[in-house]
């Protein structure tokens, strides 16, 4: 009888341990899937050279992802030192400029916005063609 009780207790420990491991893995998976999801996806297009949508409104703490779905290089920046026209880019007071660098076809860039205000950005490659956009971040 004691052997049967020990066997049952051992099986119970194994099952409980397995369920705890599954629960931890599930919590990690849920946390990653929530963190990885952008609030908005902006598509970078070739013809005409443009962002879609051109203007978007999000909440502070949200993430925006720019995806190069075209066949050309694209670039997303709010950095005045990268822009041809300084008026094409801006960040609100207290926010740092961001710059994706060159994005090849199929690549993407994400930015999480914590400072409320208006962010004006451009594609440094196609700025002369008017490829500009705006993210409005609300509190």
How would you name each of these model-derived features?
Residues 2-19, 23-139:
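Extracytoplasmic copper-binding redox domains, predominantly the cupredoxin/blue-copper superfamily
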């Amino acid at each position: 009888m004691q052997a049967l009780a020990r066997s049952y207790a051992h099986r119970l420990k194994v099952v409980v341990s397995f369920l705890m491991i599954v629960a931890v893995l599930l919590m990690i998976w849920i946390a990653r899937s929530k963190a990885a999801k952008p609030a908005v996806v902006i598509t970078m297009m070739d013809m005409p050279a443009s962002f879609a949508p051109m203007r978007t409104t999000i909440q502070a703490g949200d993430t925006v992802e720019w995806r190069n779905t075209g066949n050309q290089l694209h670039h997303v920046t709010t950095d005045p030192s990268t822009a041809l026209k300084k008026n094409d880019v801006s960040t609100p007071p207290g926010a740092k400029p961001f710059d994706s660098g060159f994005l090849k076809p199929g690549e993407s860039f994400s930015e999480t916005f914590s400072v409320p205000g208006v962010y004006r950005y451009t594609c440094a490659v196609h700025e002369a063609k008017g490829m500009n956009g705006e993210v409005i971040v609300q509190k």
